[in-house]
């Protein structure tokens, strides 16, 4: 995903009259992720806003809703929670748990290859989350470092379940296009687009190889050439690249990435059991996975805080920035027929009739005033208590 460099036109918009778009985190080919706020519950959220070209695609929207509901029913701490889904104007969106931290990709860029005990610390929650999904009949289809999030508290969570399937269902998606990320696709996904739990297992096997060596097993001039190499070649042993990799990890990768799905672990449950046996055999220590320091999420949070601070220092209500620009004169458009509805509902920048940036300013101002009055009350209470204690002591002396 590509990090934002300039202010995004959706920032400060209120999606579905509920979700405030605060700051862009990153964007990719089909969507953009923002940090946001559920103004109804006053809860931070992550907003994945799909590209506007999907807004009128009923096949995509139907699959998008189904996948969101299926993932929302899963209750596993290793999966990024899905709170809501909807469409506002030309923007289908997904509301998810906001993970304050970064991605496994960013951690690999910062620190490079991992030792075996750190690899196990990453894989345990990833396989645990996948196991919960596989039990429910769900397949991820795009397991990769970009979809594995690490919180500042050390939690590892898997994100983006079902999005590949939703995009595949879109009528605008060309037939025969390989969906997913080439470096992590299983041979059957490349060959005919089919996927089952063993396809996720293959992707995890590639991930293990990358965590141990610092790079994926296949390289090429294009995504297509990288994808097709796995049809005729096995994933090499990590120990041939990095000295000291235990043979048990070579065996784990080999079993997970067998070209024939029948020769792989049946699902994440089976692979997770083998991982635990290896960790016990090697007596690997526990490890807390660190979040990347210089992540897109951290930069987005810092940017948003700086904007709020600057607005507060100005001592005036912030000016509302509209998310749309008038591109034609009012007379250029004929009046809509009676009873007709617009093709798309507009994205509103207001909450309860108030410009959303003014709403934020007022909410923060109210909080500051509450803190001031609480301080005053506490100070008066302290003085009264002190006086009462002094008077009581003097009376005791007199008596």
UniProtKB/Swiss-Prot annotation:
Location in or out of the cell: Cell membrane
Modification type Phosphothreonine: residues: 32, 62, 173, 175, 323
Domain of life: Bacteria
This protein's UniProt keywords: ATP-binding, Cell membrane, Kinase, Membrane, Nucleotide-binding, Phosphoprotein, Serine/threonine-protein kinase, Transferase, Transmembrane, Transmembrane helix
Keyword Kinase: yes
Membrane topology of this protein: Single-pass membrane protein
Group of enzyme by EC: transferase
Extracellular side of membrane: 390-399
Record field: transmembrane: 369-389
Residues holding ATP: 25-33, 48
InterPro entries: Kinase-like_dom_sf, Prot_kinase_dom, Ser/Thr_kinase_AS
GO BP terms: negative regulation of fatty acid biosynthetic process
A single GO cellular-component term on record: plasma membrane
Molecular function terms from GO: ATP binding; protein kinase activity; protein serine kinase activity; protein serine/threonine kinase activity
Pfam families found in the cross-reference section: Pkinase
Catalyzed reactions per annotation: L-seryl-[protein] + ATP = O-phospho-L-seryl-[protein] + ADP + H(+); L-threonyl-[protein] + ATP = O-phospho-L-threonyl-[protein] + ADP + H(+)
Protein family membership: Belongs to the protein kinase superfamily. Ser/Thr protein kinase family.
Function: Phosphorylates the DNA-binding protein Rv2175c. May be involved in the regulation of cell division and cell envelope biosynthesis.
Name by which UniProt lists this protein: Serine/threonine-protein kinase PknL
Organism encoding this protein: Mycobacterium tuberculosis (strain ATCC 25618 / H37Rv)
Taxonomic path: Bacteria, Bacillati, Actinomycetota, Actinomycetes, Mycobacteriales
């Amino acid at each position: 995903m590509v990090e934002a460099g300039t202010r995004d036109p959706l920032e400060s918009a209120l999606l579905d009259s509920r979700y405030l778009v605060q700051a862009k985190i990153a964007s990719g080919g089909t969507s953009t992720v923002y940090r946001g706020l559920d103004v109804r519950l006053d809860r931070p959220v992550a907003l994945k806003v799909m590209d506007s070209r999907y807004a009128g695609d009923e096949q995509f929207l139907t699959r998008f809703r189904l996948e969101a509901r299926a993932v929302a029913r899963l209750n596993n701490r290793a999966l990024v929670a899905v709170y809501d889904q909807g469409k506002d104007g030309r923007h289908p969106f997904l509301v998810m748990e906001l993970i304050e931290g970064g991605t496994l990709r960013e951690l690999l860029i910062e620190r490079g290859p991992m030792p075996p005990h750190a690899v196990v610390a990453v894989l345990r929650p990833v396989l645990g989350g996948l196991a919960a999904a596989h039990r429910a009949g769900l397949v991820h289809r795009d397991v990769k470092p970009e979809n594995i999030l690490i919180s500042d508290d050390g939690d590892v969570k898997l994100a983006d379940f079902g999005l590949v399937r939703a995009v595949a269902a879109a009528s605008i998606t060309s037939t025969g296009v390989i969906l997913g990320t080439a470096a992590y696709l299983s041979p059957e996904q490349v060959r005919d687009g089919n996927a089952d739990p063993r396809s996720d297992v293959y992707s995890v096997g590639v991930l293990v190889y990358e965590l141990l060596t610092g790079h994926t097993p296949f390289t090429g001039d294009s995504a297509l050439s990288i994808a097709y190499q796995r049809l005729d070649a096995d994933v090499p042993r990590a120990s041939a690249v990095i000295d000291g990799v235990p043979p048990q990890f070579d065996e784990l990768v080999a079993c997970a990435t067998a070209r024939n799905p029948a020769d792989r672990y049946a699902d994440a449950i089976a692979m997770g059991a083998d991982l635990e046996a290896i960790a016990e055999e090697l007596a690997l220590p526990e490890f807390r996975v660190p979040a990347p320091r210089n992540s897109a999420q951290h930069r987005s949070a810092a940017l948003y805080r700086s904007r709020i601070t600057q607005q507060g220092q100005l001592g005036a209500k912030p000016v509302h920035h509209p998310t749309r620009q008038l591109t034609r004169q009012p007379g250029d458009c004929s009046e809509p027929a009676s009873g007709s509805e617009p093709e798309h509902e507009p994205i509103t920048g207001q909450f309860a009739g108030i410009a959303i940036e003014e709403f934020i300013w007022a909410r923060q101002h109210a909080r500051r005033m509450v803190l001031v009055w609480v301080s005053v009350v506490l100070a008066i209470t302290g003085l009264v208590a002190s006086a009462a204690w002094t008077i009581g002591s003097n009376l005791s002396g007199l008596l």
